[in-house]
């Protein structure tokens, strides 16, 4: 999800006392990252579901999760590839903390909110104004005047 690490670096600079971890499957995207002055972040190549499972088994508690512009897998046959349709989705709740999902697909954000509510999380969906984009996708979508959406979920 972290792509080239732009969002990870931005979140680290905005939260200097936090350890920020960015995860992406693509070595190519991670290689394109330009290190910033912030030293409180790391980029990891891997699958989120495997890393979440390891963190849960190690009893790690998180403060905040950002799931930024995930592949929406628009075909019905691919529902289980969506974060909220994957069997590992409950691990996010087990890790604790608030969750923020951003997408240019409103249905994706609405589905995520409904699934998070089934886990017992409080959710709020609203439009997003990308005046200071967190990701390259967010920058591109905002430049193309696409509607952006955010779901914020937190323990009830």
Task: Write out the residue ranges for each language-model feature.
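A short glycine-rich, Lys/Arg-flanked "PGG" loop and its adjoining helix->strand segment in the class I
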Residues: 84-98
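S-adenosyl-L-methionine
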Residues: 34-59
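Short beta-strand element of Class I
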Residues: 18-21
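Class I S-adenosyl-L-methionine
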Residues: 108-115, 119-156
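A short SAM/SAH-binding and catalytic strip from SAM-dependent methyltransferases
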Residues: 64-79
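Class I SAM-dependent methyltransferase "Motif I" SAM/SAH-binding loop
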Residues: 1-5
